Amino acid sequence: MTQYQALIIGFGKAGKTLAATLAKTGWRVAIIEQSASMFGGTCINIGCIPTKTLVHDAEREGDFSVAMQRKVAVVNFLRDKNFHNLADLDNVDVIEGRAEFIDNHTLRVFQADGERVLRGEKIFINTGAESAIPAITGLTTTAGVFDSTGLLSLSQRPARLGILGGGYIGLEFASMFANFGTKVTIFEAAPQFLPREDWDIAQAIARILQEKGVELILNASVQAVSSQEGAVQLETPEGAHLVDALLVASGRKPATTGLQLQNAGVAVNERGGIIVDDYLRTTAENIWAMGDVTGGLQFTYISLDDFRIVRDGLLGDGKRSTRDRQNVPYSVFMTPPLSRVGLTEEQARASGATVQVATLPVAAIPRARVMDDTRGVLKAVVDVNTQRILGVSLLCVDSHEMINIVKTVMDADLPYTVLRDQIFTHPTMSESLNDLFSLIK
């Protein structure tokens, strides 16, 4: 049995950053990842990096096969870099294998050449999330059905792509494949498109997708999936639909299966997410959980912040917690991207605040004209009494950069007038925040 001060299960953003930090302070660390193809974590290998690389090339009407080759090169470079960032440290052992708990201090690791047992003073779980597959007849047995990981491995572009689920993952793939030239159909079971966004924002997104040729079918109750003449057939009460490939984009769930958490006294919620407190401590006193596996917001930057919280608890004053996050922005990398921080208009009004709303069409922004992309709208919700920004939605080119400016102002508890009167360079998309907040009176 090998003894470590820290055992880290999962090579994700929080896990790999914590491993390097602890090792550099003298801890003996082992990080366990069940597949060498996942060194570096979900984001680098099957998430943010490969998808955004393809989005970038699709926006430039690049060749699909060439884009796929570039995607592989980008991923391989970053995976190798991440591996050596840890493996080259003297007191870090990178172990390929599947881990399960024997007790709250001991792991059994199954490797290609046998088993080994590791013991750790402290253990950190960073196993991420996995695709949630709905119970639809034939969905898991029909050729041509993929989750996002499988679709990212295609060598040839499908002429027709069906997407099961109209959420944020589905949006990115729909926009990307449409830009590559694929006929895309989104099958959304709900009666409303993007219910987490304001209706006007959701409608603007729908129009942009439809202009790309994307078909959006709401109330699409897919009852069965099967193979039909070399294609994938989706059966609904309204009739059958044929596609060449089907993406299952119905969400992701915490990856806790097989960890044998009960042996360590680690509790999970009804969705399998590991229950943690504000400091990411589990129900076992020497075990922490970080990132998507807790069932919270599934963003790489949240996983990174989880690392900061755990680091502060181990090496600092222990005051940092999840309560310090304030306003968490997000971006959906469709074309153009959607970015939001804070409340929607509907949420703000429901809170009882007296609000004023400003909207600005992207067509009114000079930089958008320069970049020849005038699609979308900017929207701000402000509390009239406090002059504080309650929320902002940006559907426009470069919104993924702009939203971080808004978050900074909101976190600093500054009035909206800071953005209204801020000096920005010209011509830029950021200066449109001047115009947007000038509409608040």
What spans do the regions from the language model cover?
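Glycine-rich dinucleotide-binding loop and its adjacent helix/turn
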Residues: 48, 125-183, 187, 215-216, ...
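Flexible, glycine-rich terminal cap/loop adjacent to redox cofactors
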Residues: 9-37, 42, 49, 53, ...
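FAD-site-proximal beta/loop scaffold in flavoenzymes
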Residues: 140-157, 240-317
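A Rossmann-like FAD-binding core segment of flavoenzymes
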Residues: 93-96, 100-111, 118, 181-278
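N-terminal Rossmann-like dinucleotide/flavin-binding domain of flavoprotein oxidoreductases
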Residues: 2-4, 35, 42-117, 197-220, ...
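Beta1/beta-strand and adjacent pyrophosphate-binding region of the FAD-binding site
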Residues: 1-12, 157-167
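Beta1-alpha1 glycine-rich phosphate/pyrophosphate-binding loop at the start
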Residues: 6, 11-77, 176-196, 401
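Rossmann-like dinucleotide-binding cores of NAD(P)H-dependent redox enzymes
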Residues: 40, 73-80, 152-153, 158-162, ...
